[in-house]
A protein has these predicted regions:
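Localized chelating/binding microdomains
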Residues: 11, 33, 90, 97-101, ...
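Conserved core segment of the aminotransferase class I/II
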Residues: 1-77
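Short, surface-exposed alpha-helical segments at coil->helix boundaries
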Residues: 52-55, 84-85, 118
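PLP-dependent enzyme catalytic core of the Aspartate aminotransferase-like
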Residues: 114-166
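Alpha-helical structural signal in soluble globular domains
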Residues: 60-64, 86, 90-94, 123, ...
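Short hydrophobic/aromatic beta-strand micro-patches
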Residues: 23, 108-110, 141-143
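Conserved glycine-rich beta-strand-loop-beta hairpin in the small C-terminal domain of fold type I
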Residues: 59, 72-88, 97-110, 133-136
């Protein structure tokens, strides 16, 4: 059996509404039904039911407002691509080590020494570069940085890391 879970909260920019789904794939319908029953009981016992506004929003977006949603979504995808392309190019140009990145909200700097990562994270904060410390790296939210501010960010980060590494 294969299960695929997704969140509508981020996809439909409905943060906090907690709307999502789990899709089950199996060759045996009985297995799917049994798993669906278990998941339904577990989800209801853990989170109760989603609120009506989340359900209404989902239905509205995928029916009446689908074309507008897809158009708006494409706009944000383009913005994210522009921001990440700038950051990735500048990171490569200055030698800032990052984990492989395909797409998404975050680029993660690769810093395997966790003590150094903690120092770097703190230094970033001192320079008003707000990041999230993660295991063996630092997460940069390119989704929250405007295009003008993302320009030069990788170099600033690399310079800070170099100062701490000396």
């Amino acid at each position: 059996m294969i299960t695929v879970a997704f969140s509508c909260s981020k996809t439909l920019t409905s943060y906090g509404m907690r709307c999502g789904a789990l899709i089950l794939f199996a060759q045996n319908e009985t297995d799917v039904n049994d798993t669906m029953t278990v998941m339904e009981k577990y989800a209801r016992a853990t989170w109760s039911n989603i609120n009506n506004s989340a359900m209404d929003n989902f239905v509205y977006v995928v029916t009446d407002n689908r074309d507008n949603f897809l158009k708006e979504k494409e706009t944000y995808i383009d913005i994210m691509k522009e921001r990440s392309d700038i950051f990735l190019k500048e990171a490569k140009d200055c030698g800032l080590d990052i984990y492989p990145y395909k797409e998404g909200f975050f680029v993660t700097l690769k810093i395997e020494d966790q003590k150094l990562a903690e120092k770097v994270h703190s230094a970033f904060m001192d320079h008003h570069i707000y990041t999230v410390l993660v295991n063996k790296g630092i997460r940069v939210a390119v989704c929250s940085v405007s295009v003008p501010k993302v320009k030069g960010l990788a170099k600033k980060m690399k310079d800070i890391i170099n100062c701490l590494s000396e």
